[in-house]
Amino acid sequence: IGPENGVFAIVDADQITQVFTNIVKNALQAMQGRENSDIIIILKSHIKNNLAICPDIHTSNMNWIEISISDNGPGIAHDVREKVFVPNFTTKNTGAGLGLPISKNIVEGSGGKIAFQTSDAGTTFFIYLMKA
């Protein structure tokens, strides 16, 4: 994440682009056929505060960047929530079920964390990366 906004993260640019692509692609698929579909991406800079979605970050002395990607799709069904990061798991007719597992590996391989919150009003993925 770069100089355009003055916030720098420790992550490979090509890899984090793949993470964003995977999450946004899933969001677009989830909202397919819905009117007034929105995807909102927010970047926040944190110093160990307000990170309730990923509490183990609180124990770290690092400063974090939070990127949230939200959609207003139908949300992730209860019975699949624990499987979204499992390789080869998919609820779709096409695809290999690798987008979110690859995203998790990239984020965690960069020393970060990925988590999500979901309801019938939509889903938000949270990506936490160490500030450079």
Residue locations for each model-derived region?
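Detector for a conserved hydrophobic position within an alpha-helical segment of the HATPase_c
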Residues: 107-108
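Short beta-strand/loop element within the Bergerat-fold HATPase_c
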Residues: 38-50
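Short conserved segment of the HATPase_c
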Residues: 62-64, 76-88
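Acidic ATP/Mg2+-coordinating residue in the GHKL
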Residues: 71
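Conserved catalytic submotifs in the C-terminal HATPase_c
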Residues: 1-7, 46-48
